Amino acid sequence: MAKMMEPRFKLSRRLGVNVYGHPKAMNRAGNGSYRGSKKLSNYGIQLLEKQKLRAYYGVMEKQFKLYVDKAMQSTGVTGEVLIQSLECRLDNMVYRMGFASSIREARQMVNHGHLLVNGQKVDIPSYGLKLGDEVSLREKSQQVEKYISNFTHFEGQTLSYIDKNIEMLTTKLVAIPSREEIPIEVNDHLVVEYYSRR
């Protein structure tokens, strides 16, 4: 599977936003903006927003373009549909639900078969969760201290579209998130514009 190879903190600083949520991601020796003072063209700004959105979800360009194409064919608002689809990916939801401390760790957990969706093992990171889907750890995975610690001591943002049962170690997608609820800093309209002109 292809991976985004640029170091995470360096990528966050290049994009000008903390796409990984780590408190030290934007730290850098010296002063001034990492991206410098060069003024971007309209195309450059659109490209930057696209790169931000890809980085938030750790999705490679080929797969990202498939999400864009599907969103453009939908009857909803393209940018909102795009981000909703990315947000509901299993790897992202495993992170949002608190089973993992990062999307990268969440993706590894999914790939290694640690998660169940509605009681069935799912090992496809891009699997799209649907309204009412329940996510839980496999019985053997419940013995892994790190996963339990992640879940019970989760320090991330509490989201209204996720319901957590700490005692049962289960979570459920109780609503399809609106754009306003999804905690990412990106102008999805500019992302759509970037692909519309290509």
UniProtKB/Swiss-Prot annotation:
- Entry's Gene Ontology BP terms: ribosomal small subunit biogenesis; translation
| CDD domains registered for this protein in UniProt | S4
Query: Entry's Pfam families?
Result: Ribosomal_S4, S4
Fetch the PROSITE patterns from UniProt: RIBOSOMAL_S4 (PS00632), S4 (PS50889)
Top-level lineage group: Bacteria
Work out whether the entry's keyword set contains Magnesium: no
List the keywords (alphabetical). Ribonucleoprotein, Ribosomal protein, RNA-binding, rRNA-binding
User: Residues in domain S4 RNA-binding?
Assistant: 88-148
Q: Which cysteines are joined by disulfide bonds?
A: none
Q: Name one GO molecular function term.
A: structural constituent of ribosome
What function does the entry list?
One of the primary rRNA binding proteins, it binds directly to 16S rRNA where it nucleates assembly of the body of the 30S subunit.
Q: Which PANTHER family match?
A: 30S 40S RIBOSOMAL PROTEIN, SMALL RIBOSOMAL SUBUNIT PROTEIN US4M
Into which family does the record put it? Belongs to the universal ribosomal protein uS4 family.
What is its quaternary makeup?
Answer: Part of the 30S ribosomal subunit. Contacts protein S5. The interaction surface between S4 and S5 is involved in control of translational fidelity.
The protein's matches in HAMAP family, at most eight in alphabetical order, are given as: Ribosomal_uS4_B (MF_01306_B)
- The name this protein carries in UniProt is Small ribosomal subunit protein uS4C
